[in-house]
Amino acid sequence: ETKLGFDTLKVRAGYNPGDHNQAVSVPIYQTASYELGDTERAKRLFAFSELGFVYSRMANPTVTVLEQRVAALDGGAVALGSGMAAVTYTLLNLAEGGGRILTSPQLYGGTFDSFKKIYPNFGLTIDYVPDINDPDAVRAAIRPDTRAVYVESISNPNNVVADIETLAGIAHENGLPLVVDNTLATPYLLKPIQYGADLVVYSATKN
């Protein structure tokens, strides 16, 4: 079987023109809802026992191509409305409404502001390690109610490069997931999951 290269995957993965009237470019589906067919098929769709489209808030053919394309590049994907939505969705699910997130102060401004002003409203405490590449400092900052370690592979905007492999080892020693924002590096330069990261987030507008 021929293995497609990165440059081919980034423009072709997840899309079959034959499923879209032979359109060369991915169509933009603007509909909110979809014909469900008969009631039996509708029941299967709403029970998620059959793949298909019901309502665009849940799934949309255009978004599905994006998810499948990123999955081909980086191993898996869920597309959300923004990079900040991806960060929030990930961390709130990991923290389950409480606990602590361990991170670096070297972060994208939107993330840093959210950590300061929004996350405490959800019962989360954010702990900062001044040098995220200091293993002893990271270990010392982990507490019993720490739920995840979050880091940017290359911080925005000051370009601090995180030692993902070491951070993953420390996180896993303590039963924690490592979440990496890989926006600046992109999967072309770095695939954090290959170095031990558990979850990876991106802002598509920046790469």
Where are these regions (language model features)?
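Glycine-rich, flexible loop/turn motifs
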Residues: 2, 7, 41-42, 51-54, ...
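Short, mixed-charge, low-aromatic patches
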Residues: 20-28, 43-48, 92-96, 125
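Short intrinsically disordered, low-complexity coil segments enriched in acidic
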Residues: 1-4, 73, 155
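Conserved PLP-enzyme active-site core in the AAT-like
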Residues: 10-16, 78-207
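Conserved N-terminal alpha-helix of the aminotransferase class I/II PLP-enzyme fold
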Residues: 33, 38-89, 110-119
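Short conserved active-site loop signatures built around small residues
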Residues: 1-29, 65
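Short, hydrophobic/aliphatic alpha-helical segments
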Residues: 6-10, 67-72, 196-198
